[in-house]
Amino acid sequence: MADKVRRQRPRRRVCWALVAVLLADLLALSDTLAVMSVDLGSESMKVAIVKPGVPMEIVLNKESRRKTPVIVTLKENERFFGDSAASMAIKNPKATLRYFQHLLGKQADNPHVALYQARFPEHELTFDPQRQTVHFQISSQLQFSPEEVLGMVLNYSRSLAEDFAEQPIKDAVITVPVFFNQAERRAVLQAARMAGLKVLQLINDNTATALSYGVFRRKDINTTAQNIMFYDMGSGSTVCTIVTYQMVKTKEAGMQPQLQIRGVGFDRTLGGLEMELRLRERLAGLFNEQRKGQRAKDVRENPRAMAKLLREANRLKTVLSANADHMAQIEGLMDDVDFKAKVTRVEFEELCADLFERVPGPVQQALQSAEMSLDEIEQVILVGGATRVPRVQEVLLKAVGKEELGKNINADEAAAMGAVYQAAALSKAFKVKPFVVRDAVVYPILVEFTREVEEEPGIHSLKHNKRVLFSRMGPYPQRKVITFNRYSHDFNFHINYGDLGFLGPEDLRVFGSQNLTTVKLKGVGDSFKKYPDYESKGIKAHFNLDESGVLSLDRVESVFETLVEDSAEEESTLTKLGNTISSLFGGGTTPDAKENGTDTVQEEEESPAEGSKDEPGEQVELKEEAEAPVEDGSQPPPPEPKGDATPEGEKATEKENGDKSEAQKPSEKAEAGPEGVAPAPEGEKKQKPARKRRMVEEIGVELVVLDLPDLPEDKLAQSVQKLQDLTLRDLEKQEREKAANSLEAFIFETQDKLYQPEYQEVSTEEQREEISGKLSAASTWLEDEGVGATTVMLKEKLAELRKLCQGLFFRVEERKKWPERLSALDNLLNHSSMFLKGARLIPEMDQIFTEVEMTTLEKVINETWAWKNATLAEQAKLPATEKPVLLSKDIEAKMMALDREVQYLLNKAKFTKPRPRPKDKNGTRAEPPLNASASDQGEKVIPPAGQTEDAEPISEPEKVETGSEPGDTEPLELGGPGAEPEQKEQSTGQKRPLKNDEL
C-alpha cells in the first residue's frame, strides 16, 4: 500500500504542475484579451475596442474626442498626430501629411499621384527606383513612404486604444474602401506589419457598416429577404451598397441572421474633400481680388495661407449645410492681412454642380451589379459626413425615388462598431452571437495559360485559355482549385483581373496594372519520372481569397493514382489504431478514404466554378473547395456543367451520389459486387477488391508579382526599425517632458508651502531660507539650462530638492496624523480594558479563557498605556522643528499588537462550545450559587451558530496569532453598558456570528 501511495505522489505533483502552468497561461492571456478596430477614413479615423466587461466602445483620444484626424506632422526630432498635427498644418504645411491613403499601392504614372500633387503642391514627392512607388521628401534627412506614414497612424491608434483599455492590444480589424484592389490591400497589410499589429481581417467599410446595422436590428431579420441600400459619401470617395438581410440555416448554429453584399457602386474622387477644395479655390480668388491693386503675390503660392483657407473651407461647408449664407473670415491670412468674405449656399452649390450630377452614378452601378431594380429596395440609408450636404440629399432622393432617406444609423461610427464586432467574433477570447457575413468580390480574377496543340498532323499552334477563378460579386472568403490535365513538364500560368468593363476609362487608369502574378512551376517533369507506373490526375493549384480579400496561391501539387490490391494483413497495428480513433471521433471512414487507402492526402470537396466552360477536348478543370455551406433558398442553383469542361466533376458527383445510396442500403451493397456486378461465388468472395492509392508530389513555385512588387523583407525590416526608433524617441520625449513638468511643479508648490502656517510652525527661519534659495536656483537652472537637460538630469535635480525638503514634509505629515491615530489608540485601549473586565467576571464554571491568556492581554494593555504616556511626555519636551519621537507608524504597530491579542480571545470565544451544567434530581439544571452577584446571574455564554447548548465541549484551541500582518486587523468596536448579550435568531433559523461588542 505504501508503495502504491509513493507511486501516486509523483503523478499528483505532475498534475498540479500542469494546472499551475495552465493557470499561468490563462492569467497571461487575460492581460491581452482586448481587441480593437480602426475605421480608417480619408479625413479622420474612429477606434473601437472590446475587452472583458467593456462591450464595443468607441475610444476617446487625448482631447476626449471620438473622432481623430488622420494627419501626421513629421519634424526632425518630433512627431505630432491628430488634432495636434492639424494645428501644426498651419505652421509647417510641408511636414504635415494628410490624405496619404490615396497614394497607397500607386506607382509614379498613376493619375491619382498627379492629382495629389495638384491638390497639395507643398509636398515634395520622390519615387522608389525599384518599385516606382511614392515617397514624401520632408527634408534631406527625412523620407517616408505612404505605408510607413500609415504604420505610424495605426501605431498611434493602438496607443489610444491601449490607454483606453488599460492593457496591451495586438489584434485588430481595419476597414478599407471596397474599391481597394490587391496592391492597395497588400499595402495596408504591410503598414500594419510595420506597426506591429496582427490584422485579424481587412473588412470593407461598407460591409462593416452593414454588419453594425444588422447586429443592432437582429430581431427585425427573418426568413424574408430584406434589401437595404447604404449610400456612403465620405471625405474622399462615395460607395453605394445593396445588402440583403435574411435568416438562413447553418450547419454549425442552426438558423442565424446573414448579410449578403449583392451590389456595389463607387466613385473614387466624389466626396467632401473635392467640395472643400473648390471652396478653397473660391476663397483664394476672393482674397486676390481684394488685394488686386496692391501688387501682392498670389495667395495660391503661399502654402501656409492655402492651409488656412482649406481649414476655413471645411468649416464653411459644414455651416452652409445648415445656413443659407455665412461669413468666411481669417485673421492674418497672408502678410498680416485679414480676410473676410460672404459665401452663400447657392454659390457653393454652383461651384459643385458637376459633383452633384455624379451622385446617382454609384446607385446605378450598384443596381446593375446586383441585377435589381429600385422597387426591390426597401430603404436607402445615408452614411458618411458628406451626405449631410442638403443638395446631395435632394439629388439622391430624386434618384432613388423614395419618400425619404433613412438616417437611423450613426453615420460616423457605424463602420467602427461593425468592425469591432467582427474583431470580437474572430478573436478566441470572446463569444458573440453568430452573424453570417457574405462579402462580394468586386474585381473578377481569372487564370490564363497557353498550351501547344496539334490542330492537324504535323501542324502545331499555341492555344490561349482563360478560366474565371473568382467571378464578380461572387462570395468570399473562398478557396478554389484549378487542375491542369495535359501538362507533363514545367510550365507557367498567369493570374490576372477579369473583365473590368464596368469601370470607366479614367477609373481603369487609376486602377493600375490588370496583371497580378506570373506563376512558374518547377518539378512537374520530375514528379512524372518519380511515379512512372501511376496514372496522372493533373497538376492542382490551390487558391485562397481570404477574409481580407487578398488572393494567395497556397500550394501546387502533382497528383497520381494507381490500383492496388487491398490486403488486411498489410495493415499495421498503428494503422488499425489510427483508423479506430478516427472512427470514434470522425464518425467513421468516408467512402473516399476507404477507396484511397492509408497513403492518400485528403482533399476538400470540389465543385465546378462559374465561367469554366472549355473548348471541346480541353481537360483543364476549375473546382471550388467546399466550405461550411449556408443553405439559402433564395439563391439560384449553380449552373450545370456543359460539354467537356468538367468531366471529372461530374464523375465526382455521380460517385458521391452512389456512395450515399450504398450507405443507405447496406444489404444491397453486401449482395452486389463492385460496379453493380452480380454476387460472386463463395470462393471468389474471399478475394479483396482493388483500391486506389493516391500519391501527391509538391511542385516548386516561383511567383513574379506584376501589379506592384511587394516590399523586400530587408526593406520591410528597415521600415519596422525606423518606426520603432521614432516611437522610442517619442516615448523618451514624453518621459523628459514629464520629468520637467514634475520638477517645475515641485518648485512652485514648495515655494508656496514655505509661507503656510503649518510649515512655518515646524521649521526655523534659517531652514526656510535654505530651502527657498535652493528652489530659486533650481528654477533659474530650469529656465536657462533645462531646455538642453536630459531626463536623467531633470530627475536627479528633482530628487535633490525632495531630499532637502524631506524632513520638513515629514514633520508636517506626522503632525497631521497624530490626532486620528491617538484617538484610535485610546478607543482601542478603552474597549480592550472593558473586554478584559468582562472576561474576568465570567463565572468559573463558564470560563473559557485561561488565566495566562487574560494576564497576557492585561500586560499588553498596561505596556501600551505606559508607552503612550511616556512618548507623549517626551514629545512635549522636543521643539516642533526637531524630528518627532511620536511616530504614526509606532502608534499603528502598538494598535496591531493589542488588537492581535484581543482577536485571539474573540476567536476562541466564537468557536469554543459552552460547558454543560450539572442536573439535579428533578432533571432541571442547577441554579447558580445564591451568593453570586447580579451580573454573574445575568451573564450567559452564547453558543456558536448552528450548535445546541447540549453539544459536547471541544478541546481548547491552540493560541494562533491571527491578523498579525499589518493592515489585516481592524480596531475593535466593543459595545458600551447595556449591550444585549444574547444573539437573536435570524429568519433562516440560524444564529448569526458573535460580534465583538456582544461579550
From Swiss-Prot:
Assembly, per entry: Part of a large chaperone multiprotein complex comprising DNAJB11, HSP90B1, HSPA5, HYOU, PDIA2, PDIA4, PDIA6, PPIB, SDF2L1, UGGT1 and very small amounts of ERP29, but not, or at very low levels, CALR nor CANX.
Tissue and organ distribution: Highly expressed in tissues that contain well-developed endoplasmic reticulum and synthesize large amounts of secretory proteins. Highly expressed in liver and pancreas and lower expression in brain and kidney. Also expressed in macrophages within aortic atherosclerotic plaques, and in breast cancers.
Leader peptide range in chain numbering: 1-32
Compartments (UniProt record): Endoplasmic reticulum lumen
Organism: Homo sapiens (Human)
Stated name of the protein: Hypoxia up-regulated protein 1
Keywords: Acetylation, ATP-binding, Chaperone, Disease variant, Endoplasmic reticulum, Glycoprotein, Nucleotide-binding, Phosphoprotein, Signal, Stress response
Molecular function via GO: adenyl-nucleotide exchange factor activity; ATP binding; ATP-dependent protein folding chaperone; protein-folding chaperone binding; unfolded protein binding
Effect of A419P: In IMD59; uncertain significance
Residues modified as N6-acetyllysine: K883
Annotated stretches, region: Disordered: 578-694, 909-999
Stimuli inducing this protein: By hypoxia and also by 2-deoxyglucose or tunicamycin.
GO CC, alphabetical: endocytic vesicle lumen; endoplasmic reticulum; endoplasmic reticulum chaperone complex; endoplasmic reticulum lumen; extracellular exosome; extracellular region; focal adhesion; membrane
UniProt disease link: Immunodeficiency 59 and hypoglycemia: An autosomal recessive primary immunologic disorder characterized by combined immunodeficiency, granulocytopenia, B-cell and dendritic cell deficiency, recurrent septic infections of the respiratory tract, skin and mucous membranes, and disturbed glucose metabolism.
Bias type Basic and acidic residues, positions: 611-626, 641-672
Main function: Has a pivotal role in cytoprotective cellular mechanisms triggered by oxygen deprivation. Promotes HSPA5/BiP-mediated ATP nucleotide exchange and thereby activates the unfolded protein response (UPR) pathway in the presence of endoplasmic reticulum stress. May play a role as a molecular chaperone and participate in protein folding.
Gene name of the encoded protein: HYOU1
Family annotation (PROSITE patterns): HSP70_2 (PS00329), HSP70_3 (PS01036)
Alphabetical list of CDD domains matching this protein: ASKHA_NBD_HSP70_HYOU1
Residue ranges of the motif Prevents secretion from ER: 996-999
